[in-house]
């Protein structure tokens, strides 16, 4: 797989889970003999939802809820077949969204 690059994007609502998953990916791929760039922290998306506290009136009384999406980027430069195979077998938590591009 000479000259190729694998780009992995991780998304999660919990920053500790995404950091441990990124660390696990980097350790697995470096043990398989490929070079890794990252994990690079990407900007955190902050989604704020505003709702009225009362069911009928009192529009001045509102409550804000926010949902933060943490993202990380990992590049695998010149991946070996052993590294790709170990990536496929890797077990990661369910609350981490993974996008892999070649």
Curated annotation (Swiss-Prot):
Checking PROSITE patterns in the record gives: RIBOSOMAL_S10
Question: In Gene Ontology terms, what is one molecular function of this protein?
Answer: structural constituent of ribosome
GO CC entries: ribonucleoprotein complex; ribosome
| Domain of life (superkingdom) | Bacteria
Q: Which HAMAP family match?
A: Ribosomal_uS10
Q: Please provide the record's keywords in A-Z order.
A: Ribonucleoprotein, Ribosomal protein
Q: What does the annotation say about its assembly with partners? A: Part of the 30S ribosomal subunit.
Instruction: Outline what the protein does.
Output: Involved in the binding of tRNA to the ribosomes.
A biological-process GO annotation: translation
Indicate what this protein is called per its UniProt record. Small ribosomal subunit protein uS10
Q: Which SUPFAM superfamilies match?
A: Ribosomal protein S10
Matches recorded under InterPro entries: Ribosomal_uS10 (IPR001848), Ribosomal_uS10_CS (IPR018268), Ribosomal_uS10_dom (IPR027486), Ribosomal_uS10_dom_sf (IPR036838)
Q: Does the keyword NADP apply?
A: no
Q: Which family does it belong to?
A: Belongs to the universal ribosomal protein uS10 family.
């Amino acid at each position: 797989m000479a000259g190729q690059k694998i780009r992995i994007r991780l998304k999660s609502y919990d920053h500790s889970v995404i950091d441990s998953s990124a660390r696990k990916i980097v350790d697995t791929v470096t043990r398989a003999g490929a070079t890794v760039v990252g994990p690079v922290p990407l900007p955190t998306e902050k989604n704020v939802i505003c709702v009225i506290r009362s069911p009928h009136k009192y529009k001045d009384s509102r409550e804000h809820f926010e949902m933060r999406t943490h993202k990380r980027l990992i590049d695998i430069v010149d991946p070996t077949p052993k590294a790709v195979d170990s990536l496929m077998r890797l077990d990661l938590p369910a609350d981490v969204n993974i996008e892999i591009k070649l």
